[in-house]
């Protein structure tokens, strides 16, 4: 059984999708040890409780430095014998302590066809750009923002009559298929 921790900052829909894939047996030999969140009021906490997944709430402002924050996370992850970190809407850059402790073992999903539209509101950027195609990317995490090695991408059309909300739903649907598929191939 490979132990993973999932990091999320917001609603946690990708977190819950992964958990449901584990619970249904579609993601085999994986144990979700805990949800790690950096916001005490994040909806992902409710999703974790619904699935009886332990939750660690660690807000960086509780610590003297980013290094102290990450060292605390590394301690918790090591106590749970976590082997992989899966980022699912975690809105912080991963720093050197976590990167060093989990080198090559941190995945992220991003709602664009990287290297286009890194960072926040990637779907909005694609929508307003006039692009006709966008998608989702799973990549390894490095010290940059959405700059790690690309593992796999999935595409969808941006139709002229799509609203931004419709496009967000299309990309979310891609993510729900793509992320568990990549995790199944990579996390061993």
UniProtKB/Swiss-Prot annotation:
(6R)-10-formyltetrahydrofolate binds at residues 66, 91-94, 108. Transmembrane segments: none annotated. GO terms for molecular function: phosphoribosylglycinamide formyltransferase activity. The active site is at 110 (proton donor). InterPro entries: Formyl_transf_N (IPR002376), Formyl_transf_N_sf (IPR036477), GART (IPR004607). Catalyzes the transfer of a formyl group from 10-formyltetrahydrofolate to 5-phospho-ribosyl-glycinamide (GAR), producing 5-phospho-ribosyl-N-formylglycinamide (FGAR) and tetrahydrofolate. This is Phosphoribosylglycinamide formyltransferase. It comes from Staphylococcus aureus (strain COL).
